[in-house]
From Swiss-Prot:
GO terms for molecular function: ATP binding; ligase activity, forming carbon-nitrogen bonds; zinc ion binding. Keywords: ATP-binding, Ligase, Metal-binding, Nucleotide-binding, Queuosine biosynthesis, Zinc. CDD domains: QueC-like. Belongs to the QueC family. This is 7-cyano-7-deazaguanine synthase.
Length: 219
């Protein structure tokens, strides 16, 4: 364990919760930051707060409602249908979201004396979001370091993991059931197994079933 401080970009979903559990194993002191941008499932904020409390971690909540105004899409508006069309970005793409989140997480890290910033983005289950790519995160890391003259390190523990491997990591951290039962991934705001219909639920459940097969608990 590194005797350093870290901050986790935290939504209360499967990926960011797994990253938080990973960070708690890796760093002596960990805090979280959650962004409220009037997202489609607003209970995300409450779920993040609840999980942070259960794990004994401080949660910072930042009001990013301007993002909703700037980037209306299916993730921020209930009247926009969730859909994925061939050759186009998904309707849930929020332009610049991770750029904004990592920038503000870095500012907060500067203020609280944290060198390490953790985010749950990944390329393997790439949903078509350009700001989930490894090259974007590395570029952002260089930018925030130059902007604040600090040696921040942005960690992406899930970058090269698919959903089955993300479940495996949660299991290795001793928290498979915790992640399965407490996190909110569903675009329709249903905790744990979700609605079973939206793209996020399909990806989550498919990964879980694949991991159960890998583990030998499914035929």
């Amino acid at each position: 364990m590194k005797k350093e401080k870290a901050i986790v970009v935290f939504s209360g979903g499967q990926d960011s919760t797994t990253c938080l559990l990973w960070a708690l194993k890796e760093f002596e002191e960990v805090e979280t930051v959650t962004f409220h941008y009037n997202q489609r499932h607003s209970q995300e904020v409450e779920v993040a707060k609840s999980i942070a409390e259960k794990l004994g971690v401080k949660n910072h909540l930042l009001d990013m409602s301007l993002l909703n105004q700037l980037a209306p899409n299916a993730l921020t508006r209930n009247d926009i249908e969730i859909e994925v069309k061939d050759g186009e970005l998904p309707s849930t793409f929020v332009p610049g979201r991770n750029l904004v989140f990592l920038s503000f997480a870095s500012i907060l890290a500067y203020q609280i004396g944290a060198r390490h910033i953790i985010t749950g983005v990944c390329e393997t289950d790439f949903s078509g979001y350009p700001d989930c790519r490894d090259e974007f995160v590395k570029s952002c890391n260089v930018t925030v370091n130059l902007a604040m003259e600090k040696p921040f390190v942005i960690h992406t523990p899930l970058m090269w993991l698919n959903k089955a491997e993300t479940w495996k990591l949660a299991d290795e951290l001793g928290a498979l059931d915790f992640v399965k039962n407490n996190t909110l991934t569903c675009y329709n705001g249903i905790i744990a197994d979700g609605c079973g219909e939206c793209p996020a639920c399909h990806l989550r459940s498919k990964g879980y079933e694949e991991y159960m097969v890998m583990k030998g608990e499914r035929a």
